[in-house]
Amino acid sequence: FNERVDEIKQNKNNWIVKTNNKNEFTASNIIIAGGVGSFEPRKLSLQGIEKFEGNSLFYSVKNKEEFKNKNISIFGGGDSALDWALELSKFSKITLIHRRNEFRGAPHTLSEITKLEKIGKISIKTPCQLDSVQGDKVIKSITIKFDDGKREKIDTDIVLSFFGLIMKLGPIAEWGLNMNKKTIEVN
């Protein structure tokens, strides 16, 4: 149907249902089949960073061709970060940044990352985190802070962040339904 319910309101003995396509329905009963909700990427927590989203900061890769011949800083230590580091290293300079010393990816992928680091195709920075971002409309460089307090500035065109996904109830949470521990109470 490619239609999402964005709003429901109780009106006397009926429900008014509004969708993202501007359709409106009246129903005597509703069934909410929201599953576990929707998922959103866990975002970088740095004040003001959202202004770079979509132009030089990304939480997913939709078209890898957009990242050709770029200096790319990839944050994360799991399969997504490692897989994209491998793929994008074919045509871009990659800096892989993780808060721990160890990565949590597939063994074969880790082996390939290590090989690429040895030949200079991928630079690995651990254990560290993003400290600041430099740039006006687009990111020009980032500063990372290591666990020992040292900082390092890295010139970069693109920041990719892969810190996993978080569950959101989406619009369901705003419908005014009686909720108990993220579940809807029914009568």
Which residues does each predicted region cover?
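Glycine-rich dinucleotide-binding loop and its adjacent helix/turn
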Residues: 36-85, 90, 186-187
